[in-house]
Amino acid sequence: MRGVVKLFFLSCSLVSLVSSEETGKSPTANYDHYMPKATATIDPSVFALSNDFEITDVPTTREYTFDITKALASPDGYEREVYVVNNMFPGPVIEANTGDTIIVHVNNHLEEGQSIHWHGLRQLGTAFMDGVPGITQCPIPPGSSFTYQFTVSHQSGTFWWHSHYSNSMADGIWGPLIIHSPNEPLQRGRDYDEDRIVFITDWVHDNSEVVIAALATPEGYKGSPAPPQGDAILINGRGQTNCTATGSSSCTYPPPPEIHVPVNCRVRLRFISATAHPMYRITIDNHPLEVVETDGTAVYGPTVHEISIAPGERYSAIINTSEGKEGDAFWLRTSVALGCMFGGIDQVGLAVVRYTGNGMVSTEEPQTTAWSDLAGATTPCAGLDQTYTLSPRESFSAPREFSQSHVFNSQRGAFVNVYGNTFQGYGFNNISYQNQIFNPLLSIVQRGGSCESTLVASTTFPDLGSGNIIINNLDGVIDHPYHLHGNEFQVIGRGTGALSLDNLTNIDFNLDNPVRKDTLWIQGGSWVVLRITTDNPGVWALHCHIGWHLTEGKLAVVVIQPGAIGHMEGPESWTNLCANTDPNAFGPARRSPSPSIQSSKTSTFQYLREVKGKVVKRRGAREA
C-alpha cells in the first residue's frame, strides 16, 4: 500500500484566496491593499540535505502546497519586491525517491498568470503536467489554483523547479528538486557521506517585467540592447551587491552564505544554475572537484579546479574534507564567464565552506586564495562536456538506427509578428515564437490538429523509435544554453559551422555511451546532434534557457507521437484552466506590441495588461 507524505508550507498570503470548497466556484482573489506586507525568509541552511531521508524503492506520495505571493527581500543587501513560494527565497526543496508520486497544489496569489515547470523531469506519460503556458497548459489565473501530479519514473539525481511564465522565474520563483534511488549509481554512505545543494542565480534589482519592457525600447535596459548581467550573484539565496552603485542609503552588505560540511568526509555538492543569463565558473579554494553527475546522469568525470555551468544545468561534484580540521574555512567563488558576456564586468559571488565538528562553529572569514590555473577573463565559454569526457556510470550506447533527423537553425535577426510589424528577436527556422497562451499546442494536437504554423517552429517524430535533433547555432558569436523538455538526449556529435541533413552521413558520431543531458551549451557558429528516444508522447519545448532570450522568441517545439497524444486525456482541472479565455490572445513577451488583445476574463486575468507600459519606481538610483 502506498504511503502518503503531506508537506504543507505555511506563509503569509498577500491576497485572500477564497477556496472552491467555500463557494463551489473557481477560486477568486481579493486584491484590496495589494502591497507586499511580508518579508521573505532567506535561510541557506535548508540546502543541507539530511541523512535521515529514507532512500527506498517503496513508492509513496509526497504532497506539497505552494503559495505564490509577493514579498520584500534584500538577498544581496538591496531591498526590492520579489516573488516567493511559501514566503521562502529560494522556494522549498522537494525531495523524493524514484517511483514516488509528487503532488503540488499551486495557489497563485499574484496579479498575473503562473505555472511551474519541473526542470529535467521527463513527465513520462504526464505531458499535461510539464508546466509551460501556451505549450502544455493555460496559465494558472490570478487568484486560482492548480494541482500538478506526476510520478517520477526511471530518473534520479539533481533537478529543479521554476516558473515558466514570461521570465518571472528571475523574480524568485524557483527551488531545488532532488530525486534519490536505492539503485542510483551514486550511493550515499558508499560514494559520499554528506549531501549539500548549492543553488546559484543571477540577481537584478528591477522586476523582470521592467527589464523586458525596457529591452523592447530603442534605448534598451540601462542603455544597452543586451539583457542584464545581474546586479549580484546569489548563492543559496544570498549575495553582496555594490551598495555604492545603488544609491540607496538603506543598502547593506549581508554576510556571505555558509555551507557547513563535517570534517573527514566526502561531501556531494549539487550545483544548480537557476540564472537567467550568465554562464558561471565555480571553484572552491584548496578543494579539487570530482565531477560525478550532470543533469540527472551519474558520470565518471574529471577532477577539476573549476566547473563551468550554464543556465539550467546541474552538476554534482564531490569534495574531500579530510585535509583540514574543524573550524577551517574556504571561499567558494562563483564568477561570470566574461568570454560570452559582451560588455560584462568582472563579478564574483562568494560563499564560505566551513568545516564543522562537535565544537563551536567559527565565524571568521576565510583567508584562502584562489587556484592559480583558473580561466581568465577572455577564456572562451565552453560546456564541461566539451572540455572533458563525461561517461555515464550506467552505460547506454546510442541506438545505431534512427528513423528521422530534423534541423533547428537557431537565429537572431529581424522577424515579422502577427500584426505585420518587424522586430528584432530570436527564433528557430526563421520563426520567432509568438505564444497564444490560452491555446496550448498540446491541446491542439490532442484534438487532432497540428503545430505547424508561422507562430512556432516545430518538428514531429510520429512513431516510437529514435531520432536526431540537429541544432545549428547561427547566432554569430552568441552562445546559448538549450534545454529540451520531456526528454533526455545523448550528445553524439559537435562541430563548427552548420550541419545539413545531406552531410549527416559524413559525420563520425560518438555512439559509445555518450553523455546524457537535458540542457546543453552550444557556442555561436557551431552545431550539435542530439539522439533522442521517441517514447514519450507530448509537445515538448526546446528553448534557450537565457530567460531574456526566451521572452524574445527563442523557443521551438518537438512533437512526439501525435497519434498517441490523441488518446491521452488530461484532468478536468487542466481543461478548466482555459475556460472563458480567448484562444487568439498572446502572452507577455518582449516584442508583444498590442495591449488591446486580452483574455475575456478581464476582471482578474489580464495577461497583456497595462503593467507592461507602466513605470515602476526603484528604491535606489540607477547606475550611471
From Swiss-Prot:
It catalyses: 4 hydroquinone + O2 = 4 benzosemiquinone + 2 H2O. Keywords: Cell wall, Copper, Disulfide bond, Glycoprotein, Metal-binding, Oxidoreductase, Repeat, Secreted, Signal. One of its GO terms (cellular component) is extracellular region. Residues 69-183, 195-355, 469-562 form the Plastocyanin-like domain. Cu cation 4 binds at H480, C544, H549. Its main location: secreted. Residues 592-603 have a biased composition (Low complexity). This is Laccase-1.
